[in-house]
Every structure is written in structure tokens, then in C-alpha cells.
Amino acid sequence: MRGVFIVIVTCLVFLPDPLRAGVASIGSITPGFGGSQMNYINNDGIFLESNNSAFGFGFVTTQDSVTLFTLSIIHKSSTKLIWSANRASPVSNSDKFVFDDNGNVVMEGTEVWRLDNSGKNASRIELRDSGNLVVVSVDGTSIWESFDHPTDTLITNQAFKEGMKLTSSPSSSNMTYALEIKSGDMVLSVNSLTPQVYWSMANARERIINKDGGVVTSSSLLGNSWRFFDQKQVLLWQFVFSDNKDDNTTWIAVLGNNGVISFSNLGSGASAADSSTKIPSDLCGTPEPCGPYYVCSGSKVCGCVSGLSRARSDCKTGITSPCKKTKDNATLPLQLVSAGDGVDYFALGYAPPFSKKTDLDSCKEFCHNNCSCLGLFFQNSSGNCFLFDYIGSFKTSGNGGSGFVSYIKIASTGSGGGDNGEDDGKHFPYVVIIVVVTVFIIAVLIFVAFRIHKRKKMILEAPQESSEEDNFLENLSGMPIRFAYKDLQSATNNFSVKLGQGGFGSVYEGTLPDGSRLAVKKLEGIGQGKKEFRAEVSIIGSIHHLHLVRLRGFCAEGAHRLLAYEFLSKGSLERWIFRKKDGDVLLDWDTRFNIALGTAKGLAYLHEDCDARIVHCDIKPENILLDDNFNAKVSDFGLAKLMTREQSHVFTTMRGTRGYLAPEWITNYAISEKSDVYSYGMVLLELIGGRKNYDPSETSEKCHFPSFAFKKMEEGKLMDIVDGKMKNVDVTDERVQRAMKTALWCIQEDMQTRPSMSKVVQMLEGVFPVVQPPSSSTMGSRLYSSFFKSISEDGGATTSSGPSDCNSENYLSAVRLSGPR
């Protein structure tokens, strides 16, 4: 397919071409190029070199096997790896790399590398003297750059920006580490069940402050220092990692699988020289310098934490699946033991407390009642309680002590892993006594059991269903807090304050003992409600983002299914843009724009930054919540669809809300993350216009808002669609024009024409130019009119009370796109 850059893995045998063996292209390759590692075996697999011959791109052997290869960029003289395309999916020496005549880059077989090039054809691939691999379009612009997609290495002059992530290869304990810029700081975290931060540049003693204030949004290795800039490229901080002040040297920073960042000077034609500076500088400052539950002290001297060594000789907790239950649905016997005195934990300086101003007994109870909690830390001075679902290495706290009391959860000695043989032995004497005492009692018991079985069959089947769900929840990574039903019942005052009601249940206001407020969704019924519960816990429970609503916890107890979210005082966007009376608060343009931008960032994170691509499938104003400062947070993931990174489209049953669904839902085409883009475009239009996308009370010209917006665009009068009730809207404000054009790009009928959500963010921020979109005023009415008529006959559409022209075929497409939910 034209316009898509794809690298694919295969087992297709390719015979080497002796005429081309060992000859690497210099500077760039053009369409028609092809070859395997065997073709370039005399050049160590390198088939493309930079003009200065410092860097090479080609097939590089992996550390684990000399017969498997990654498509990588290397610094030739030092053989240091700079970037890899397929680190997780190496290829064989016969797999053929092809840059075909259409400008696509392929290796026929299983897809491992994909690039959406926004409809531009590639004319060449360049390996630049900086080590940057660039796909160049026919008009000479860059389509894609390796510098924008780092793996575990950064190199001099490479911009590392907010939204990018450096990820280590897995460690021996299967842990990975990540470096990213978040909330104005650069942080290192371990990707355990719930990521735990263990280092930040803002707290680094070596940091040099060049300018107070400002928010870090990017960084680069320049000279002998790591430099940090704000959005206007003003230098805020520096981190000097070498005494070598030669600005002509090339440095790399590598995030190793031990969680440590090291620096190497690639020199000029010489072998690499490593700097003694490391991040973190403390030998005991990483999550696992010694292994879980060991204490690291001094020069990385390791010993089992004293409390655990007294309880178990092997320094292991005996817990493999903390939330697993025994065959008779009982919880495995566990206990909390003191970790001992004088120990500290790496995440305490960065993690938020689970509960504030509490006491030690309550903190223990919180951990005991939460099956995913493996350890707790309690600070006497503040009353803060910290719970962790992963415990790495401890470290000695020094003479002053850490100020924390710590406890570890371990399996009780002699629990036997939940074997039911002991229980059977206990029950057998009672059965014998009953049989001996009276046959009559046995007959009565049999009769009662039979009656219960007949009358309450669903109740008797509930444990099996509950066990199935427990297994599902147990196998989730990053599972949030599991509440008991009575705790949420108490927090909501027996569900007395109702905030709203949706398709799967009602939402109630609640307050935890520490004073933090919750919004508790109580799912009702079975079927879709059960699916929504699993989808919500599995998807949002493991991800965290400023613009995604946080799932504080859940309850799966008997027939009860509840979801506990952070409480957002301003409610949903719907109540703020669709004003029911003149006295309602009117949002100004700055607030509306920030809501639009925040929502776009949240969706971009779901689509591009999670382990699996997440398609929300139900973006609408009711599912965008607002906090005290009107920051937008995307909510309600009950209809979301997971897609692997290899999938570009997926078929699924229709889901969502009428008026916001993309055309592909109606035409039974495969959907993708671009379907969310369409829904977002509809919401953005409503946010700009302060009205619903279909309003039969309007004139025939205005009743279908998207068609009206396209018409005004063609007339050059886009300002006519802005909410007329907003006062003092600056017509010269570029954000207004960008937002309106971006909305019309998002609701294009052809999904390939719609931008990605990350591109939408760039368009709104002014980073990417927003040209006038193609006209699509009829909105595909020829495709959807028959669908609309069919749902109208079934009672799925509401008859308009407005002008008759509003019900004409020209307006059918987006009026009731999705049909009944």
C-alpha cells in the first residue's frame, strides 16, 4: 500500500548476490534496494553508511544469538548500538530487507515495524552523519526519523522530548526500566505491576540550575552535559557527566537492563571511553541492586532483610500469586512481618501515599485487605501510609533512620499452598458422627440440599463464576486496589448520594476514611455489565495519565461489581457546553481550548503510548470529566477495544453512542484508532459551537452542525460556527482557526484522511501546520441512509420535531450514525 512504511519479518530464503556482497550504500538508499544479512556478510551485515562513515545501518547480531539479527544503527568504530527497529523480534540471516519501487520498506512475513506517513511517498532513506535514520518524501520533507523513536540510547544532539520514552531491554528478573519527561521533570521508573519511580533529575544533587522556574519539556546531550529546556528552548538545567569539555566529541547515554544510565564518549575514530558518572550515582539507588527483599548497603553489600530472614530461611515470601484463592474459594493464609529497623525503600520519595493522617493499625489493615499489596511503609511523623504491589531491594537508611516502619506480607508457615486434603480430613469425622447418630438427619440434609440446588441454581453456580473472575483479575498486571463491598458501602453512606446514571449502572459519591473523595460506579445486571467491569479494570487499572480518569480501585465480591474512581468535582463536559438555561456558567475560549487539548493528549496516550493500542470506542462529552481546574480526563472504558501493535484494523461488534460513531461502524468496515479520532472531532465541534451536532430545533441549514461547519468553511466564514454566547473571542487568535480546521479534519469520511491523535495534538499546539481540509459536507449520506431508515423503523431513532428538511437524506449520515447501543 502506498504511503505506509512497513518493516516485516519473514522466513523466506534469499540466496546471496555475489555481485553486491559486502558493498554498502553511502548516505542513502532509494526504491529498488533489497538484500539480506547474507548479501552483506563481508561488511558485517551493514548495507547503509553515513556520508562520514561514522555510522552504519543493517543487520546486527543480538547478544543472545549469533544467528539472529536486529535492524540497527551502530557507531562503526566502537560497535556501540544507537537504535534498533526490531529489538523484540530479531530476524534470520536470510530475511530480506526491501525498499520497493512504491517507496515502501518491507520484509515479507510478520509485521514488526510500521509507520503512518500521512499519505506521502518515500523517495529515499538517509543515514545522516548525526546517526539519525530518516525516511524522506518525494518533496524532500522528513516523514519519519529514528531520533523521534529512541530505544535504550540517546546520542549527542538528539532531542529527547516529553512524550518519548527510553526503555531498557528486560533484566534477568524480567523487569524493564523506563526514562521519560513527565510533569516538568525527567524520571526513571521500574515497570513492575504499577510503575515505581526511583530517580528524578529534579532531585539529583548533580543538577545545575541555570534558570529558576520554567517547565522542562525536552533535553539533549550537548558537549559534556545533559541540558534541559523549556518549550521555548530556554536552558533551565544542566547535568555535567564528564570533565572532557571538547564540544566536538559525540556522547551516548544508555539505559541498561540494570536500571542504570551510563555515558560513553564515542570519540573521533577512536574506541569509546566510558564516563565514571552513572545515573543513579548511588550503587544501591536502583530497584534491584541485590534482588527482591534483600537490603543493599555500602558498596553494594547485600543481605536478606532481617524480618524476613527470621521468618523464612530462603529470603522469599512464599507468595507467587497474592490474589489467588484455594480450591474451596478461601484466601491463602498470609501474615505481615516487620522488615526490621534501619531500612529504606527507593520509591518512598516519589510515590503518593495510599492514605494520609492514619495510624499504623489502619495501614496494616489496608494492606491486609488488599490482596495485591506485598508491603507497606508507615511514617509516624505524618501518618502517611504507603502500599506497594512490587517490592524490590531495600537499602540501609543511615544513622538518622528513614522515619518509616515497614512490613512485608508473607505466606504463613505450613499453609501448604491451599491443599484441600486437610479440610477433607476435618470434615470426615463430622460426617461419620452424623451417620452414626441418625440416618434421619442425613435424609433431611439431603432434602435441603436438593431444594437449594433446584431453587437457587444461579447462587450455587456463583462461586465458579466468581473463581473464574478472580483468576481473570489475578492475572492482570498493575491491578488497582481491591475494596471489600462493605468498605464502599460505608464510603458512600449506603449509596445515598447519586451523581448520575449510565448504561450499565449508577454512580455515587463516596469518601474514604482518609478524607479522599470517590465516584463509585455500581454495575447493575449481567451480560454487558460484566464485560464492562472486566474491560474497565483491565484497561484503565494499569495505565496512568494526567488526562485519563484514575481508577482508585474495584470490588468483585459475590454478585457485587463496583468501580471506584477519583472524584472530579466539575462533572462531565456535557453539562458545561450544552447549557440548559441562560443562568448556567459559560466556558470561555481558553478553558474550552485547554479541554480540547487535554482530551486529545489522553487519547493519543491510549493509541500510541500503551503496551497495547487502546481504542476507546465511546468518546462523547458525557465521558470527558473535568477536575477543579477544568482539566479534562477521559473516562468510561467499558466499551474499549484492545489492539496489538501489529494490528492496524480490527473487526468488532458495533458499540458507542449515536451521533459520535465513525462511518466505518455503520458500513461494517474494520475499525481502528481513527474511529476515536472521528468521535473526538464531533466533540471538538460541539465544544467550539456550544451545541449538539444535531439539533432539530435549529433551521434546516444549521440543524446538522457538521454539514453547516463544512459549508461555512467553503464560504470562508468559519467564525460563524463559534458559540455566539462567548464574549470577547479574539478573531485573530490562531487557536480558534486551528481548532475548527482540526475538527473538520477529524470527521473526514475516509479514515485514512483523518490525522492520528498525536498529530491532532501537534495541530492544536501549532507545531504542525493545519491546512484547509477537504470538503465532506454530505457526510457520506449515501452510505448511511438505508441504515438510518432501518433503525427508524425499529424505533431506534427519534423523530425530529424541527423543520422537515432536517430529516432529508442529505442529513441522515451523522444524525443517528450508531443506531441503538
From Swiss-Prot:
Q: Which gene encodes it?
A: SD25
User: What pairs make up the disulfide bonds?
Assistant: C284-C296, C290-C302, C363-C385, C367-C373
State which residue ranges cross the membrane.
430-450
Please state every residue range assigned to the domain named PAN.
Answer: 323-411
Q: Where in the cell is it found?
A: Membrane
Where does the record place the modification Phosphothreonine?
T652
Q: Which residue ranges does the record annotate as region CaM-binding?
A: 581-599
Record GO cellular component, one term: plasma membrane
Record: active site: D618 (proton acceptor)
What name appears for this protein in its UniProt entry? Answer: G-type lectin S-receptor-like serine/threonine-protein kinase SD2-5
Organism encoding this protein:
Arabidopsis thaliana (Mouse-ear cress)
* Entry-linked PROSITE patterns: BULB_LECTIN, PROTEIN_KINASE_ATP, PROTEIN_KINASE_DOM, PROTEIN_KINASE_ST
Q: Which residues bind ATP?
A: L499, G500, Q501, G502, G503, F504, G505, S506, V507, K521
